Amino acid sequence: MQMDEQNAAEVLSGSEAGQLVEAALASGADARFEVGGASMAPTIGPGDVVTVRPASAEDIRVGDVVFYRRSDGSGHVLHRVLWKRHTAGKWVLRTKGDALRSLDPLVAGDQVLGRSTTGASRARAWRGLIRVCGYAAVS
């Protein structure tokens, strides 16, 4: 299912909940919260509860689902990492919601607050199912 960027619900954007999650991660604690948007469907949907573990950009791998602060401070996002580069001594990530067509603006390493442990495992399971179905169709 593809969604237009305009129809995608924001994840914790501008809410006090996002600030609480950020504070928990900054203290070194894992944070659990209910996702409000559909930008990561079908892997993570509205109402799903995710666990986010503190992580720096250096710890992040391509394919991880990361929780980060928007560069303008207007809220927080939970999206998948498409690529990661180390340039001029700093990390830069490209992220995108699974259900969105458009890419997110570049994410600076210092915007990254954590990695979803829940969403990451579900995402791997989803990709594994696609591989199995694809193999069965080709065989």
What are these model-predicted stretches?
Residues M1-S139:
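Extended hydrophobic leader/signal-anchor segments used for secretion and membrane insertion
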